[in-house]
A protein has these predicted regions:
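N-terminal acidic, glycine/proline-rich low-complexity segments
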Residues: 29-281
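Bacterial Sec-dependent N-terminal signal peptides
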Residues: 1-30
Length: 281
């Protein structure tokens, strides 16, 4: 069993990435041989609209994952499960075109069934409080009989993960966590400290800089700048049309590195290069 000191800091990231086109081509990929089990915890609709951008990316590549949960977990702001359901509605409209290019996409109803409401608001000083639908779902998924771990991709605060670990500490050996840290650390300081102090052996990647590789650089030559929306995203299905609502179409997609980490390379070895970065202790 792969075990390593569980807090990793971003070392380097090399990305070549194209998003939100109906024709999907992946070149130079080191495909994961078995679909990873994933659960996404997101503060979509909360403090940062880039979660909608990354959710669009996830939905367009959802055939690559065995998705077991989509949890709304906004430490701040007014995000809710409805924000997830709204994105799935757009995905449902685009699905016929997506199916023309590749098989294996989950049905919209299957995705709706695994949308759960987590905590709305930051955890108190002790780092946990009462169970939520989202934290209970994390426990249920983690406890499934499987030879594969449940990868929990955290796009916001750690509040529901901390609650799940508090209520069911036995799951710590059944999950692996990739957390988009950075600003999210200040939104869920209490739950972060609780996890670090009480679960030192939890398999946990803390990625504090990977998202910077996705933020639009207006000065960059070519199409990978503020013109990217007009050249590559505008009119690309319902998800593409929706994209303009978030940062006026400028690409941020700060949570996407967690998806890329699962799509390429060896997720069990964070020290090797992958699309989602390589990490050191």
């Amino acid at each position: 069993t792969f075990k390593i000191k569980r807090i990793y800091i971003m070392k380097k990231l090399f990305l070549v990435f194209s998003i939100l086109t109906v024709s999907i081509t992946v070149m130079g990929q080191q495909p994961i041989p078995v679909k990873p089990r994933i659960l996404i915890s997101t503060d979509i609709g909360g403090t940062d609209p880039d979660d909608n951008q990354s959710m669009a990316h996830f939905l367009m590549y959802s055939e690559m994952f065995e998705t077991e949960g989509l949890v709304s977990s906004p430490s701040y702001g007014h995000g809710s499960k409805q924000n997830l359901l709204d994105m799935i509605d757009l995905y449902e409209k685009d699905l016929p075109k997506l199916k023309k290019h590749i098989k294996g996409f989950p049905s919209p109803d299957a995705l709706r069934a695994i949308c759960k409401q987590g905590r709305q608001g930051a955890a108190p000083f002790k780092g946990y409080t009462t169970a939520t639908e989202g934290s209970d779902w994390i426990i249920k998924c983690a406890r499934k009989e499987s030879t594969r771990p449940l990868w929990i991709l955290v796009w916001g605060g750690l509040d529901d993960l901390a609650q799940a670990l508090h209520d069911a500490p036995d799951i710590q050996n059944k999950i692996k966590v990739y957390w988009i840290g950075g600003p999210n650390k200040k939104w869920s300081t209490n739950s972060y400290v609780y996890i670090v102090e009480n679960f030192p052996n939890l398999w946990f990647i803390e990625a504090n800089a990977s998202y910077r590789g996705f933020i639009t650089n207006d000065k960059q030559p070519g199409k990978f700048n503020k013109d990217y929306y007009d050249e590559c995203i505008r009119g690309a299905g319902y998800l593409g049309k929706d994209y303009i609502k978030y940062y006026d179409g400028k690409v941020k997609m700060g949570d996407t590195p967690s998806l890329l980490y699962m799509m390429d390379g060896d997720p069990n070895n964070p020290q090797k290069e992958s699309w989602g970065g390589s990490f050191e202790k």
